[in-house]
Every structure is written in structure tokens, then in C-alpha cells.
Amino acid sequence: MTDVAVIGFAEAPNERRSPATTNGVEMLVPIFGEVLAATGLSKDDVGFWCSGSSDYLAGRAFSFVSAVDAIGAFPPVMESHVEMDGAWALYEAWLKILAGEAEIALAYGFGKSSAGTLRRVLALQLDPYLIAPLWPDSVAIAALQARLGIEAGAWSEQDMAAVAARSSSSAITNSRALVSPPDSVAELLDRPYVADPLRAHDCAPVTDGAAVVILAGGDRARALCERPAWITGFEHRIDSGSLGTRDLTTAPSAGDAGRAAGAARAQVAELHAPFTHQELILCRALDLGDEVSVNPSGGALCGNPMFAAGLARIGWAASAVMSGRAEVTLGHATSGPALQQNLVCVLEARP
């Protein structure tokens, strides 16, 4: 079985309202060029392309087909798509290399979240029989989750504000993030609720954006990248889709995926947590101690483009290895309501 590594990553600037169309082409073309130039590759070198996006954001069926224009319609390429975050497209690309069907693969995710009312669009992923007809929006569900944790003594509003303050401070060095001036915990707690107990800083901003990651196998990875980020564990698990049948203050699927992937050795963890309390849940589920640097990029709280933010977390985790800032890192992505489905990718450097 071939070893597989991340050799390139690029992310479009996170924007609250991009002038780009919903097919993502305007966001993808620049970052395709950026990542291919950085790795010394051309489009012809890529043996497999896989995208992650959603027709629900674009408002039309098979909307991802238009995004292929960013690759180029001719000559034909081997291409696939997942109606998921681009992190799951990366998983498919990883399997393609492991199966020996490609040496180099490129995964990308994109989403124009501002095209509709995102918190209502996400209600369409709920149980269609009992929950979705009530139209509880994504922020309201997250607020219920946060309140359950507070009442159970698992965390406090102060803990949540501390996550927001740290994320804002970390994002200052990330030129692609939506950066707000960092405030103190006390200042954040003095702000009004948007959905009790959530304040604006507890919620990831509605974001338009895209991300791309290039994988290569074995000797090709070593030849193309001075310090590849080798994938040593890649797992995803899912909890019940029924909100009433699981403990929303925990994320068992994240813990299971982390243990299977070997998350315990991570020095840096990039977690896809769209709400402050969800970062706290994930840190507990993945058993991340205080010695682990969590979301040094600022995380999803400083830019959460739908269907690209999870892939970007893996990209930032890989960047920490490729730059020499860490030996072992963890990238995480989530999907579904209240951390229902979770994916963990562990990356490390090798001599």
C-alpha cells in the first residue's frame, strides 16, 4: 500500500459576501493556479480531481458540474464529487491513490454561503419527518446544545468567550481569515445574545470561500515537496441523525474517529468548530491537553465557508508540518447538525 502525503494547500480569502457566482469558478481558478505553481505541477500531472460542495447553497441541481470549468473542459479529466465538505473529497482522493489509480490527486471544496439564508438552508439536513418541518435553524440548534452543556456544568459562557478571544488573536497572522479586533473575555461577555446563550462571537461568520489540497503518493511526494505531511491516520464516524437520541454535550463519533486515526500524538489541532462551545466539545472528545496548540489559524470562527472549512482545517494542519512548525498535527472536519459526523486526519513529518 502506497504512503500518501499532503504536498500543497491553498485557500481563497474568506469573505462575508463574495461577488463570485455560486459555481465557485471565480474563487477556484486563482487557488488552483497558486497551489499548482507552488508544487511545480501542471493540470496534466493531476490524475484525479474530487470536489465537495452542495446544490442546496447554489439552489440548483448538479451545480458542481459548472465548477469543473475551473479545471478546464478539455482535455477530459478523471473527476468525482461529494455532497459534503471538501474534507470528504480529500478522503476519496486519498483512497484513489491507495488503490493505485492515481499518483497525484487534488481535492477542493467551495461554497457561497451568502447566496441564501444559511441558517435556514442548513435546516434541510435535519430529520425530514419530525424535526425539519419545524424549521429549527442551525444557530438555534447550536444554542440548545450550548445551553445543555452550561446547565450540565460542562462549560460556561466565560469558557466560550475565551475560545472566541483566542481565535481572534490567532487569526491576526492569517491573511485569508475574517479578522475582528481581539477583545477581552469581559468585553465579549458584555455583548447581547443572538440566540441565548450564544453571542455573535460564539458563531462562525457566514462566509464565502474555497480551499484546495494536493495529495501525492510515495516517491512522487518526496520528489515534489521538501517536507511532505504524511497521512498516518484518516477516519470518519457518524452519530445518530436524530437530535433526541444522543447526548448533544458530547461528540462520540469525533472521539472514535480520533482514536482510530491516532490523534493522541498531535502537537497542533485544527478543529472545524463553527461555534465556540463545539471547540470545547471536540477538545474533550479528542482528549487534547493544554500542550496542544488548537486552531492557530483562527479556525472556523474566523472564516467558515461551507463545504471548504473542513478541508481548510486539514490544509492548515498539513502546512504546520510542511513548514517545520510541528512534527504531528491533526485536521478535523464536521458535518450535520450539532457535530453529528466527524472526520479526523493525522499528519506527520518523516526523516
Question: What kind of feature is each model-predicted range?
Answer:
Residues 2-5, 47, 101-102:
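Loop/turn elements at helix/coil->beta-strand transitions in domains of secreted/extracellular proteins
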Residues 3-19:
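Generic N-terminal amphipathic, Lys/Arg-enriched alpha-helix
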Residues 22-25, 29-30, 53-106, 110-111, ...:
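Claisen-condensing/thiolase-fold acyl-transfer catalytic domains that form or cleave C-C bonds
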Residues 42-48, 158, 264-267, 290-291:
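Short acidic capping loops at alpha-helix termini that bridge into adjacent secondary structure
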Residues 105-153:
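Flexible glycine-/small-residue-enriched beta->alpha junction loops
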Residues 113-117, 169-174, 338-339:
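Short, well-ordered, mixed-charge alpha-helical segments that flank or form enzyme active sites
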Residues 136-184:
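N-terminal leader/propeptide and maturation segments of large enzyme subunits in energy/redox metabolism
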Residues 185-191:
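Short, conserved active-site entrance elements at the starts or edges of catalytic domains
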